[in-house]
Design a protein with these regions (language model features):
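Structural motif
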Residues: 94-96, 127-129, 156-158, 220-221, ...
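Short, structured patches in soluble enzyme cores that scaffold and shape functional sites
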Residues: 89-91, 99-101, 122-124, 132-134, ...
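A short, structural micro-pattern
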Residues: 28, 50, 114, 141, ...
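N-terminal, charged/glycine-rich beta-strand/loop interface patches
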Residues: 2-134, 139, 275
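Internal, conserved structured core segments that host functional sites
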Residues: 111-173
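One face of beta-strands
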Residues: 32, 83, 116-118, 126, ...
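A structural signal for small-residue-enriched, beta-sheet-centric alpha/beta enzyme cores
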Residues: 163-288
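A short, polar/proline- and glycine-enriched secondary-structure boundary/capping micro-motif
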Residues: 54-58, 106-111, 140-142, 168-172, ...
Length: 288
């Protein structure tokens, strides 16, 4: 059997394929920018730019709003990857954004983080639904994720960010991760909501503390900014499990925090709440 030589070394099943010292392995990068416009009574696509490992799909829908599905063709993120997404829901339009599958934060090298940056704007009289599926953290992952939403005073926004701590079905525990996560909502240019966390080290031990998460394997944040938010408080509380809570931080902003033992339990608890806050509809990607 012939052997191929590389830099003076034969390549066989025993050869090392580790990168040379100082080499920069290839990294995934993706960019999507999109905006909507009004066409008659319907919300339609106005502009779209996509490049690299980020793609956007637009399933056909009979509703008057525009649905967009984000796709990471790299299959996940790891240290050094960079993904940027921007979207603008123009005046009077409705835009629903989701992901084709769960995002996965894989084990990273010691130094670089995976970077995910999302920037959304909601114009006057518009509605934006930010409904990504779960982000799953793998042991050894390093993720820096930022979401900023800028709203006009009379805009409406529904947001969910579900986070899963390891693959429970495979017995994975997160004993070594790095996580930076920041969610910021601005209304009329002024800060209306800020949620930020940073962690490095043994997340499993931290989550097992009774006053932190009591061993939960997944969590979610839901924010509903709307003139109807106050009227949704009592009905939403009725739908929540014992490991979740809802409160009004402003008369027009409802915040829900939820813990669950597994990602399946989390989604099962989230779906009726999101349906309630989204006119009894959900993207088909969310179906169990």
């Amino acid at each position: 059997m012939a052997r191929i030589r590389f830099r003076g070394c034969p390549i066989t099943q025993f050869a090392s394929i580790l990168p040379q010292q100082g080499a920069n392995p290839p990294r995934a990068k993706g960019v999507v920018n999109l905006s909507t416009k009004k066409l008659g009574e319907n919300s339609v696509l106005d502009t779209l730019l996509q490049s690299g490992s980020s793609k956007c799909l637009f399933p056909r829908a009979s509703a008057q709003g525009l649905d967009a599905v984000l796709l990471n063709t790299a299959g996940g993120v790891t240290g050094g990857d960079s993904f940027r997404f921007t979207a603008n829901a123009a005046e009077g339009t409705t835009l629903t954004l989701t992901t084709q599958a769960c995002e996965r934060a894989y084990k990273a090298q010691p130094r670089p983080y995976a970077q995910i940056s999302n920037h959304l704007t909601v114009s006057s009289g518009a509605r934006l639904n930010w409904l990504p599926q779960e982000t799953i953290l793998f042991n050894g992952s390093a993720l820096d994720r930022r979401l900023q939403i800028e709203m006009d005073p009379d805009a409406t926004m529904l947001l969910v960010e579900p986070l899963v701590f390891g693959r429970a079905a495979m017995g994975e525990t997160l004993t070594d991760i790095r996580l930076r996560d920041r969610i910021e909502i601005l209304r009329d240019g002024a800060p209306a909501f800020l949620d930020a966390m940073r962690f490095s080290g043994d997340l499993q031990a931290h989550l097992c503390r009774p006053h932190v998460a009591n061993g939960a394997g997944a969590m979610a944040l839901v924010v509903f900014a709307s003139a109807t938010a106050e009227g949704q408080l009592a009905p939403v509380r009725h739908l929540l499990p014992d490991t979740a809570g809802a409160s009004l931080i402003q008369n027009d902003m409802l915040v829900i925090r939820m813990l669950a033992k597994t990602s399946f339990a989390l989604r099962r608890a989230l779906m009726p709440v999101l349906r309630r806050l989204n006119n009894d509809t959900l993207p088909r990607c969310w179906m169990l």
